[in-house]
Amino acid sequence: MPSGNEQPERPTTRNQAQARLVEQAFEQAGIAVSRHPSRGAGEPGQQALLGQAEAEEVDFLHQTGTILVRDEDVARVQGVIGTATVVDSLIVGVTVLSLEGTRFPTTIEALNEIDAQLGVGVATPNHVLSIAPAGMCPATEPEEVPGDADPDPGVCADRHEGSGVLIHVPDTGLLRGAAAAHPWLAGVEPGNKEDPFPQPPPPDPMPPYTGHGTFIAGVARCMAPAAQVVVENILSLNGAHLESEIIRGLYDALDRSPDVICLSAGTRTRYGLPPLAFEVFLRRLREHKGVVLVAAGGNDGDRGPYWPAAFPGVVSVGALSANWRSRASFSNYGGWVDVYAPGEGLVNAFASGVYECKEPPHAGERRSFHGMARWSGTSFATPLVAGLIAARMSRTGENGRQAAKALLAQARTQAIRGVGAVLLPGQDESRR
């Protein structure tokens, strides 16, 4: 029993556990990040700095002491907050400003002042996008299956599906040897020119979210066996990175002329506003005829927007439960989700080694893997849809946006009451 002066220890939630994993990786990389709790979002002083023990659920993480501003607004913003230093002209249209030396002790307080004087959304945090908090994508930690298990859903019977189509996967990279170990991954390429493969996981234990990008590539390839798939290691900080760095990677990816970009990461945002760097990037993406961005809808079990999936023009994907007839309990939902696809209990390529669970209720549990895993989340419904788009492109000659539009129209005709538009493997009308 605690004494009268002590507080009983509050249980760590899954959301908090995931946030801590990401924070630790950023700390090791020398990048300061702050928490924005779910309660009192946007209020001065409500953020919890890295290293503080907080009981609040984490709404989102952002870089401490920097903001994102449109190029045309830089002078106006500097007029409000003082001598903010230009850290980086990130891409054409977006500038990163440092708050060091200004009068604002926190990023949120600076943004509140900018909101009051210039309007909400002129400047935004430099959000952390991740495959974990907030939005928890994947929805579960990987589960053991035999090393010789078949992928589920299985490989499409027509091995020519996806021929001539390039799917780009900005994620945790491709595990060394995975393409040789699994026939359906043959020819899948790493996207990074330097250090193309992430470090192989040590046998005991492997790092968090190891194999996420490989699993995603496997799901996409099962739907489109002949598609060219490139997996980039961009979410290199325990499955996360800054919005600014991810956008830089996506700009570089456009040089490859992809047909489909499959992004299984995202974030909540301050006031639910669109993340500024993605807003500018998507305007640029429209100049690349036919390229479609498919993004995970997140796993909060919530109807609020999850970005970048919630942008108009992005194919946002929610998850169906294991029976394919209802929405998965973890999946986000709402009018901004375009389509639901199988996302619970999928089986595909993974790492080999020992994994130690980090999240309640299984924290501390050790699991042994032999190249395959069962995993759940909108993270994995997303490449299923990306693969179906690629497969349709190879059959019809449509570009990525045209194929996505046609599949979404079909998905609405087979909507499930109380769920929404649905896409399942093998149901594309163009096959008939």
Task: Describe each region flagged by the PLM.
Residues 2-131:
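Inhibitory N-terminal propeptides of secreted protease zymogens
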Residues 4, 235-311, 366-383, 417-420:
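Substrate-binding/access-modulating region of protease and related hydrolase catalytic domains
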Residues 88-98, 103-166, 178-181, 367, ...:
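Protease zymogen maturation seam
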Residues 119, 290, 313-316:
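Glycine-centered tight turns that cap/initiate beta-strands
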Residues 140-227, 248-256, 260, 354-358, ...:
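Active-site core segment of subtilase-fold serine proteases
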Residues 171, 306-394:
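Extracellular S/T/G-rich loop segment that most often corresponds to the catalytic His/Ser-adjacent loop
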Residues 220-240, 398-411:
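Short helix-loop-beta-strand segments that form the rim/entrance of peptidase-like active sites
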Residues 258-266, 275-277, 394-432:
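C-terminal subdomain of the subtilisin-like protease fold in secreted/lumenal serine endopeptidases
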